[in-house]
Amino acid sequence: MNIVVLQTDICWADIEANLAKLDSMVDDAPAEAELIVLPEMFSTGFCMDAERVALPDGGEVLSWMRRKAIARSCAITGTVAVSDAGCYFNRMYFVFPDGTYRTYDKRHLFTFGGEDKVYTCGTERVVVKYKEFRFLLQVCYDLRFPVWSRCRGDYDAII
C-alpha cells in the first residue's frame, strides 16, 4: 500500500488557515497514494481550548476530509477536536475513498498536557478494513499502553 504521511507547521487554533495549507499538500501528494495520514488535531494544533475549537461531529473539517478523499480516490485519516453529546473528544476519522468513514476516540489522554481535563476518553477499540489491510486505529499517546494495542490477530498494522 502506498501511504503518504503529511506533517506541517500548525497555525494555532486556525482551522481555515490549516485546511488551506493542507489543501495544497494533499493535492500535491503522489497520485499513487492510497492512504494519506494527517497529524493529530491537524486543523487546530493540540489545543486544550475545546470550547473554542471543537466542532460538532467534525463539522467543516470532516466535510473537507470527505471531499479530499473522494477527489483523490484514496483514504484520509487524522484527528479532530469534536463536540458530541455534551462532551469533547480527540476523534480520529478514517475516511474511505467513497466518503464514508469510521471513527475512533482517543483512549489514553495525555495527562501532562491537560488533555484529560478537557477531553473525554474513548472506550472502543476500532479496527478498520481498507483494501487488503486491517488497521488498528490509535492516536499518539495510545501507543504507550501496550495492553490496548496488543495484537489479538485482528489487525495487520497500527495507524
PLM segments and residue spans:
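Short secondary-structure boundary/capping elements
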Residues: 17, 57-60, 119-120, 144
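Extreme N-terminal starter segment of soluble prokaryotic enzymes
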Residues: 1-5
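Short polar catalytic/cofactor-binding loops
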Residues: 7-12
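Cys-nucleophile CN-hydrolase/nitrilase-fold catalytic domain and related Cys-dependent amidase chemistry
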Residues: 15, 23-97, 102
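Active-site catalytic loop in hydrolytic enzyme cores
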Residues: 83-153
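Structural motif
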Residues: 34-35, 135, 157
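Short, acidic/polar
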Residues: 17-27, 143-150
